[in-house]
Amino acid sequence: MGIQRSVTRTVGARRRGPIPCLSHFRWRRTVRPARRYPQCCGGLLPDSETLLQRWASRFHVSARNPVALLSHVGEDCAGAVQFVRSERLAAVLSGESDRQEPLSTHEIAQRLQRVRVDQAAARRLDDVGQFSLAGAQAKIALLQRDDGGWEFPAGRIPTTHILKPPSGDYDGFIENEVFCLHLARHVGMSAAFAEMICVEDAQAISVRRYDRIRTAAGWQRAAAV
């Protein structure tokens, strides 16, 4: 895979237009071989060797090649960057691949229960869109509609929230994280909005993504700066 477009767009900042994803890479309209990208791209992937190995086996790539993995799961990453395979690039740029797949309450509850014991269960092979979330805790990324419903987005449409169920290794982490984020906001610090949600018999923390903004054209990805 070559990286044909590796840019972010800073929304609402002084500098507008394309900027390099990495400060030491100049902006060029050329294809760069994936092998030339440093291991820092691995920071966009989950912190789970087991999960990365399973993805590598599923997509027939090396678990040590972050760009190869992101080419399959990186259409929705942190910030404004998207990793899009060359055969899908035209459809993504034109909006042809834009989709929103509604999820029922029961489906979300099942996903939250499954991902507690198996991080790879966050997505199925037939799901629209693909996301990659950094960190060690199991989580899923979804788009929340204005009516409170949830959807899987694809193409140019980004996820807006991250849902994390409780983990056996972190007792009470939902209450703790919600409290800490609310406390930070109360004392004037910049912090993401979070709340505890119950979906049937499944609990999770719902965190509104700080790298997504609402515009007249809908939800947009924003550079995490």
Predicted regions and their residues:
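Phosphate/dinucleotide-binding and metal-coordinating scaffold of catalytic cores
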Residues: M1-V225
